[in-house]
């Protein structure tokens, strides 16, 4: 088993560059299935386990995929298979994003029910509601969801009960090849939605209104391969903003888009963090003393749920009582118990977490419960006394490229080790003293 070992006490300083956005690239790779003519070439693609997984899904569906030098080339011009099996989908719930493109291209899709981070039920009912509105019949059973349409999908007016990012992306992709116009209301407004729409339009789609609550998609007969560069990862940028603030450091985060970080910036400035927009990105300077604040996660442009656990680590160092309320996902507080292992004064009350600070955290062996919790525990380790050992790094690898190396380059005392290697080293040390 691999683990990351971090020793607290260092101020982080320097420059770090964020990768392309994980939450943008996965639905974009899935949407590449819509192009029945030509190749799609995607640049600024992060080297993440989730990207390898979605690439394998596409290969299983009979697309040709080449991933090298942060570029993915996809040729989906051959006849596609209709089924994405459990062996792939169980690893990552974003695999369900191939359903809309398959339904639009083939008139049928059969997808194993998704996996991914264990943060609540995260149902796909809004995806299926959209497909049904466009004329598809949907069946769920035996661990699969199957959708099929006789003839072709038809444009429809669809209202989402909640501005689900995944549902917005899946329905938007499916609607590009539907007959007629689809109007999607109460749509998600995240920057990743806009990036997907830009990619679809580059392929020849007619998508308007992405980034607003109402998206209009006029169906076309065919989509073609295109070139597209993935937007920077705002969650990775936010994570390094916290790294600067929590250590009282000074970090320039390159390839960050300030407009995508407004809600994070606002809360951190409330806490006393200095944030400067520069041509290269965002510079973050941590204060000597952090102020307590309250945060409520909301759909974009509200505070992102994917930054909740990292901000929790930061608020543990703030002076006073802070509260975080999670409104987007249920069961996203599993990392609270791990913070307690580090001597944090923190408790759960319903859908909120209350923290009293500042905390004198102590290094401990902790387990990452999901992707963002993994980063949060490492951030907490940066300011803990002694050594913090973080396990279950498979979660971290789903969303961060060389996270420990980037932190080390900023001055952190951190390394990633194989448990067996560590045991051998410890044995060698004990042998020397025998």
From Swiss-Prot:
Query: Which parts of the sequence carry 2-(S-cysteinyl)pyruvic acid O-phosphothioketal?
Result: 117
| Function according to Swiss-Prot or TrEMBL | Cell wall formation. Adds enolpyruvyl to UDP-N-acetylglucosamine.
- Annotated coiled-coil positions are none
* Family annotation (SUPFAM superfamilies): EPT/RTPC-like
List positions binding UDP-N-acetyl-alpha-D-glucosamine. 93, 122-126, 306, 328
The residues responsible for catalysis, as annotated, are: 117
- Pathway it belongs to? Cell wall biogenesis; peptidoglycan biosynthesis
Q: Which residues make up the binding site for phosphoenolpyruvate?
A: 22-23
Gene Ontology cellular-component annotations:
cytoplasm
Taxonomic lineage from the root:
Bacteria, Bacillati, Bacillota, Bacilli, Bacillales
Q: Name one GO biological process term.
A: UDP-N-acetylgalactosamine biosynthetic process
**What domain of life?**
Bacteria
EC id: 2.5.1.7
Which molecular-function annotations from GO does this UniProt entry contain?
UDP-N-acetylglucosamine 1-carboxyvinyltransferase activity
For this UniProt record, the keywords arranged alphabetically read as follows: Cell cycle, Cell division, Cell shape, Cell wall biogenesis/degradation, Cytoplasm, Peptidoglycan synthesis, Pyruvate, Transferase
> Belongs to which family?
Belongs to the EPSP synthase family. MurA subfamily.
Protein name, please?
Answer: UDP-N-acetylglucosamine 1-carboxyvinyltransferase 1
Is Signal among this UniProt entry's keywords? no
Please state where this protein is localized.
Cytoplasm
Q: List the catalytic activities from the record.
A: phosphoenolpyruvate + UDP-N-acetyl-alpha-D-glucosamine = UDP-N-acetyl-3-O-(1-carboxyvinyl)-alpha-D-glucosamine + phosphate
């Amino acid at each position: 088993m691999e683990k990351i070992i971090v020793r607290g006490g260092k101020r982080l300083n320097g420059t770090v560059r964020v990768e392309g956005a994980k939450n943008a690239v996965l639905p974009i790779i899935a949407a590449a299935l819509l192009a029945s003519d030509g190749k799609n070439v995607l640049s600024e693609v992060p080297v993440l386990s989730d990207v390898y997984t979605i690439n394998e899904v596409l290969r299983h569906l009979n697309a040709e995929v080449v991933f090298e030098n942060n570029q993915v080339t996809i040729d989906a011009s051959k006849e596609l298979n209709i089924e994405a099996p459990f062996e792939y989908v169980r690893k990552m719930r974003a695999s369900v994003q191939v359903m809309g493109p398959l339904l639009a291209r083939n008139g049928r899709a059969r997808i194993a029910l998704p996996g991914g981070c264990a943060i609540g039920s995260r149902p796909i009912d809004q995806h299926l509601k959209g497909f049904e509105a466009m004329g598809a019949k949907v069946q769920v059973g035996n661990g699969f969801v199957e959708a099929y349409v006789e003839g072709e999908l038809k444009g429809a007016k669809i209202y989402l009960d909640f501005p689900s990012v995944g549902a917005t992306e899946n329905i938007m992709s499916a609607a590009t090849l539907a007959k007629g116009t689809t109007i999607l209301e109460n749509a998600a407004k995240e920057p990743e939605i806009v990036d997907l729409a830009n990619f679809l339009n580059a392929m020849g789609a007619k998508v308007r209104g992405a980034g607003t609550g109402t998206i209009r998609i006029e169906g076309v007969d065919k989509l073609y391969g295109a070139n597209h560069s993935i937007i920077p990862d705002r969650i990775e940028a936010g994570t390094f903003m916290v790294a600067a603030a929590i250590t009282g450091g000074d970090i320039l985060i390159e390839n960050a888009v300030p407009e995508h970080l407004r809600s994070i910036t606002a809360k951190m400035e409330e806490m006393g963090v200095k944030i400067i927009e520069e041509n290269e990105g965002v510079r973050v300077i941590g204060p000597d003393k952090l102020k307590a604040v309250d945060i409520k996660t909301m759909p974009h442009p509200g505070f992102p749920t994917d930054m909740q656990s990292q901000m929790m680590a930061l608020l543990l160092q703030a002076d006073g009582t802070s509260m975080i309320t999670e409104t987007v996902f249920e069961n996203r507080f599993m990392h609270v118990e791990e913070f307690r292992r580090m001597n944090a004064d923190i408790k759960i009350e319903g859908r909120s977490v209350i923290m009293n600070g500042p905390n004198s955290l102590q290094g401990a062996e902790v387990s990452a419960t999901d992707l963002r919790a993994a980063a949060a525990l490492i951030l907490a380790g940066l300011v803990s006394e002694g050594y913090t050992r973080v396990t279950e790094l498979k979660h971290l690898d789903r969303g961060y490229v060389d996270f420990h190396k980037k932190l080390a380059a900023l001055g952190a005392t951190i390394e990633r080790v194989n448990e067996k290697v560590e045991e051998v080293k410890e044995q060698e040390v004990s042998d020397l003293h025998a």
